[in-house]
Amino acid sequence: MACGATLKRTLDFDPLLSPASPKRRRCAPLSAPTSAAASPLSAAAATAASFSAAAASPQKYLRMEPSPFGDVSSRLTTEQILYNIKQEYKRMQKRRHLETSFQQTDPCCTSDAQPHAFLLSGPASPGTSSAASSPLKKEQPLFTLRQVGMICERLLKEREEKVREEYEEILNTKLAEQYDAFVKFTHDQIMRRYGEQPASYVS
């Protein structure tokens, strides 16, 4: 019987030593109403904390968020700009060559255009005719290729800065709209859940 008593005691005391003891289960209903009463307050506190966090200015988010233009380098290098200018100059020369060859192969158009030019400008002297044809042969460029490349590069940089400013302005506007909508939504949720309940002064 003593052995049976000791075995029975060990079996009876095992639930007391375990984390989920029967005594705690009996005390659980007594503490349930307090936890149920505290749950709306904790939810209200959490919602108020989220509302206060949302009350920050959207400019803080903009300062934390890196700009999408930060890692983007210039799309065209100086060598690429010069290469594009050379190709465009070659295309212009081909276009002029085609125009002059078309005028030479179509004499009817030139013969029809000569009387009108004669009536408008009068008889031309030999010096003026040679001077008029000389710019096609002896055309002096106003800028060198390097200067044209520098001008194009500066224009591209100015255009890039303008696009960046427009993008930042549009982004600020959209973020401000989202911020206002989020604040209004949070305020409506708080008023819908806890607007009818009396104010609580729980510290």
Curated annotation (Swiss-Prot):
Coiled-coil regions in this chain? none
Assembly and interactions? Homodimer. Interacts with IPO9; the interaction is direct. Associates (via SYVS motif) with 20S and 26S proteasomes. Interacts with SMARCD1; promoting SWI/SNF complex recruitment. Interacts with NFKBIZ. Interacts with YWHAB.
Q: In which residues does the motif Nuclear localization signal occur?
A: 22-27
Q: Name one GO biological process term.
A: positive regulation of B cell activation
- Whether Transcription counts among this entry's keywords is yes
- Report the GO terms under cellular component: chromatin; cytoplasm; membrane; nucleoplasm; nucleus; transcription repressor complex
Family, similarity comment? Belongs to the akirin family.
The entry's keywords: Adaptive immunity, Cytoplasm, Developmental protein, Immunity, Innate immunity, Membrane, Nucleus, Phosphoprotein, Protein transport, Repressor, Transcription, Transcription regulation, Transport, Ubl conjugation
Give one GO term, molecular function aspect.
transcription coregulator activity
Summary of the tissues where the protein is detected: Widely expressed with the highest expression in peripheral blood leukocytes.
Q: What else is known?
A: 'Akiraka ni suru' means 'making things clear' in Japanese. The name is given based on the presence of the clear nuclear localization signal.
Q: Which residues carry this modification: Phosphoserine?
A: 18, 21, 57
Q: Say if the entry is tagged with keyword Cell inner membrane.
A: no
Identify this protein by name: Akirin-2
Originating organism? Homo sapiens (Human)
Post-translational modification here is noted as:
Polyubiquitinated. Polyubiquitination is dependent of UBR5 that extends pre-ubiquitinated AKIRIN2.
InterPro entries documented for this protein: Akirin (IPR024132)
Function recorded in the entry: Molecular adapter that acts as a bridge between a variety of multiprotein complexes, and which is involved in embryonic development, immunity, myogenesis and brain development. Plays a key role in nuclear protein degradation by promoting import of proteasomes into the nucleus: directly binds to fully assembled 20S proteasomes at one end and to nuclear import receptor IPO9 at the other end, bridging them together and mediating the import of pre-assembled proteasome complexes through the nuclear pore.
Where found?
Answer: Nucleus; Cytoplasm; Membrane
Q: Which domain of life is it from?
A: Eukaryota
Q: Which gene encodes it?
A: AKIRIN2
Q: Where is this motif: SYVS motif?
A: 200-203
